[in-house]
Design a protein with these regions (language model features):
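Conserved strand-to-loop turn within each blade of WD40 beta-propeller repeats
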Residues: 1-5, 37, 44-47, 78, ...
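A conserved positional marker within WD40/Gbeta-like beta-propeller blades
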Residues: 3-7, 40, 49, 90, ...
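WD40-repeat beta-propellers
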Residues: 7-12, 50-55, 91-96, 135-139, ...
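Short C-terminal beta-strands that terminate individual repeats in beta-propeller domains
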Residues: 10-11, 18-24, 44, 60-66, ...
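Structural hallmark of WD40 beta-propellers
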Residues: 18-20, 38-42, 51, 60-62, ...
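Canonical WD40 repeat/beta-propeller blade segments in eukaryotic WD-repeat proteins
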Residues: 27-34, 63-75, 112-119, 155-162, ...
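Intrinsically disordered, low-complexity regulatory regions in eukaryotic proteins
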Residues: 115, 119, 125, 134, ...
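Cys/His-rich Zn2+-binding "zinc-finger" mini-domains, especially FYVE domains
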Residues: 184-258, 262-267, 277
Length: 312
């Protein structure tokens, strides 16, 4: 842009000129992230490698081999931690130095591949979306190992963004649904499912418990689990369905009859709003300054959404 005689002249170039080529992977790339503060180029690929290069010289600084094909990544500038999600459903946390890295830990919570990650450096929260239709919030800053599960989609999660000023999470799935989650509420962790050979409510044997079936002369039943208490129950003792928004269940799920009676109407109040983008979403970009959401779909259409009515 040139300033002359109080007029602005904008020169528009329609040609991009490549300046450097990085020989980073031996297979298809899945994610590239440029870290301006470090002048690093981070990348993941289907060759199960995470690599980082110096953007100034093009030199490879290091790499790390993941257990499965990496699919997404995020980076924390302050601590130099990188979060790598892969198709096995786990998130690997690495500490990067100038020319080496060290494994910190791995998060395992999804039953299918991790498709997207979102990192909030202010509250130190990591959000992971997966092909299992779920989102998990990992509270790293709290240092208590808290992991909150969010269930509000019927297809794989394509993208997630976090508006830390209003503490709202925006998630989009392949079926076109956009969900805005209120994270400024006191949520509860989902309980672990308990193992038992018989119903923990009526003591009826499950179908693999041959000894109790023979002793009681009763036919074995199928095992289910209450989403509120985690107990192993039979179908008769878990005939009720209910939403449990504070546990992340915005859709009705199976609960045992005794837990159903303890859920109040206030506890069933939704903590998320649902919207239809009317196209199958591939990728999303959220602008928190203007509160705009850009979605791209398989229909070759870009849609720009004004999110001010739903994002405070």
């Amino acid at each position: 842009m040139v300033l002359s005689q109080n007029l602005f002249y904008l020169k528009i170039t329609t040609k991009m000129i490549p300046s450097r080529t990085y020989q980073a992977h031996q297979s298809r790339l899945t994610m590239v992230l440029f870290v301006l503060e470090m002048e690093w180029m981070l990348s993941t690929g289907q060759d199960k490698l995470f690599t980082w290069h110096c953007s100034e010289t093009g030199e490879r600084l290091g790499n790390y081999r993941t257990t499965a094909c990496a699919s997404c990544l995020q980076f924390d500038v302050e601590t130099r931690h990188v979060f790598v999600g892969d198709y096995s459903g786990q998130v690997t946390i690495l500490k990067l130095e100038q020319d080496n890295c060290s494994l910190i830990t791995t998060f395992k919570g999804h039953t299918a591949g991790v498709t997207t990650l979102c990192w909030d450096p202010v509250q130190r929260l990591l959000f992971s979306g997966s092909s299992d239709h779920s989102i998990i919030m990992w509270d790293i800053g709290g240092r208590k190992g808290t992991a909150l599960e969010l269930q509000g989609h019927n297809d794989k999660i394509q993208s997630i963004s976090y508006a830390h000023h209003s503490r709202q999470l925006i998630s989009c799935s392949a079926d076109g649904s956009i969900v805005v989650w209120n994270m400024d509420v006191e949520r509860q962790e989902t309980p672990e499912w308990l193992d038992s050979d018989s119903c923990q409510k009526c003591d009826q044997p499950f179908f693999w418990n041959f000894k109790q079936m023979w002793d009681s002369k009763k036919i074995g039943l199928r095992q289910h689990h209450c989403r509120k208490c985690g107990k192993a129950v039979c179908g008769k003792c878990s005939s009720k369905r209910s939403t449990i928004p504070l546990m992340g269940f915005e859709f009705e799920v199976r609960v045992c009859d005794s837990c159903y009676d303890t859920i109040t109407d206030d506890q069933r109040a939704p903590t998320a709003s649902f919207h239809d983008s009317k196209h199958n979403i591939i990728h999303v970009n959220f602008d928190p300054t203007r509160v705009w959401l850009l979605t791209s779909g398989t229909d070759k259409v870009l849609k720009l959404w004004d999110m001010t009515p739903v994002v405070s």
